[in-house]
Amino acid sequence: MRLRKQELGDRNLVGARVDAARKKKGMKQKELLAQLQVNGVDMNASGLSKLEGQIRFVTDVELVALADILEVSVDYLLGRAPQ
């Protein structure tokens, strides 16, 4: 059975935090995708949109790259620490 946003959203803190951190830096999704590519993470626009929309889970490699690019801690993205 496929999870819907409201079902997945309670278990996916990372997406909302990535979205907030990206916007705080004034970065567009396209810019974040380009930086992910530079860091060896292959994600397309749909994947990032689904991640930020809390529809898609993040991998460990993506999590570390996102934290580095957005200049936040992995703990912040996981909801375990304030920014």
Predicted regions located by residue number:
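A detector for short, charged/polar N-terminal pre-domain segments
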Residues: 1-13
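Recognition helix of helix-turn-helix/homeodomain-like DNA-binding domains
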Residues: 37-58
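Conserved hydrophobic/aromatic packing and binding residues within compact polymer-binding modules
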Residues: 18, 32-33, 48-51, 77
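Helix-turn-helix DNA-binding elements, focusing on the entry/boundary residues of the two helices
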Residues: 18, 29, 45, 60-63
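Short, basic amphipathic alpha-helical segments that act as recognition/interaction helices
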Residues: 82-83
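Short basic helix-loop element that most often maps to the first helix and adjoining turn
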Residues: 16-38
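DNA major-groove recognition helix of helix-turn-helix/homeodomain DNA-binding modules
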Residues: 59-76
